[in-house]
Amino acid sequence: MSRSSQRSTIKDMTNGNPAKLILGFAVPMLMGLLFQQFYSMVDTIIVGKFLGVDALASVGSTSAINFMINGFVIGVCTGFSIPVAQRFGAQDYKDMRRFVANAGWIASCFAVIMTVIVCLMTRQILVWMQTPDNIIDGAYSYIFFVFAGIPATYLYNTLAGIIRALGDSKTPVYFLILSSLLNIALDLLFIVQIGTGTAGAAYATVISQAVSGILCLIYMKKKFEILHMHREETRISGRHIYILCKMGVPMGLQYSITAIGSVVIQTAINSLGSIAVASVTAGQKIGMFFCCPFDALGGTMATYAGQNAGAGKVDRIRQGVRSATLIGGIYSIAACIVLTVFGGVIPLLFVDASETVVIHQAHLFLTFNSLFYIPLTIVNVWRFTIQGMGYSLLAILAGVCEMIARAMVGFLLVPIFGYIIICFASPLAWLLADAFLIPAFFYCQKHLLSEKARMD
């Protein structure tokens, strides 16, 4: 690959208009997230339409534990990419390659250990979560094979994170789109044609993610000369592993700690019966689709803040946060209007019109959540910025705030108020996290400025 071609692939986010850079980076990432949610929705639609409401509830009842485990993987891999982005921003390419190599070693070890432990505990976890008896077998069939595919999740997210750390947010999207289409085709094959039940949805997800990870690996080897390593750069390094774990593990724990609250909520939902589970499943699938822009802005700000922190450009980080928050705020208003008006129609994608209770409850869930999308914007933009700046512990504490809010709702309020309070669990979590993140960001900014002044 020529130097000019490589420069066109890699994006330096330490120079240029912050708003344009953020939009230019976030839009391709958004396309990938939308396709990811699209095939996730297709999974749910096929399960709901072809296998019925109980099967829909079976898959939905695993969403919180799935988020906790796979969220840890995604968080760890995102954290691994931050030292890569910082070294790239500092133009220290040799050290950057050491981080890339050691990220591969750690990801491989984590993948093997997690797969064994989680697969052995899957059934018991579902029992602890009070999964209804009529759906627990379908839930187990689905989530066991999803967890067996944890290595594929590590493969894709580690490599995609490294590619994005170098400023290329488009290529992982292309591979994700391809894997999304493959996932849909495999869903139809396994569920409709072969009749593998809920396990078929898991087969499709794991295979398609493995394909996208392999494509990322091939692309990196062929297209990034800057990542071509000498033998000594591939060796395990205690210093690099420490830094990677210092960034990755806290970010993974951030996801998992947040998800613990979701597990408590899911347990509370399970106690309300399969109709409530199906309602929240439909609402969450739709809501996750509409929340993709917030995730894209967050992922963008991790790279943006990482590169600019590495380059010592603290003022640009503040400008980027302002721009990203404004973009997210404008979108939040539009999304709220759409979900309030049409939230009673979209659930028909997942269930028959005769399931009036499911449709009504899903609409309530979407409406109340969308009213708080501006606080969600702050959670994603400001937390990922703090993470990119290198303050991983503070990002974890924000996750603790979310966990506390959701746990309080699940343990204390659901037994009293029932389904309606489920609709406010996430909004309360976002508000409590914001109360922590806003002052935390200004602390991080002040600390970085003082560090920069001391070094100068």
Predicted feature descriptions by range:
Residues 24, 47-67, 133-138, 198-201, ...:
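Interfacial/gating helices of multi-pass transporter permease domains
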Residues 24-43, 145, 156, 179, ...:
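Transmembrane helical elements of multi-pass membrane transporters/channels
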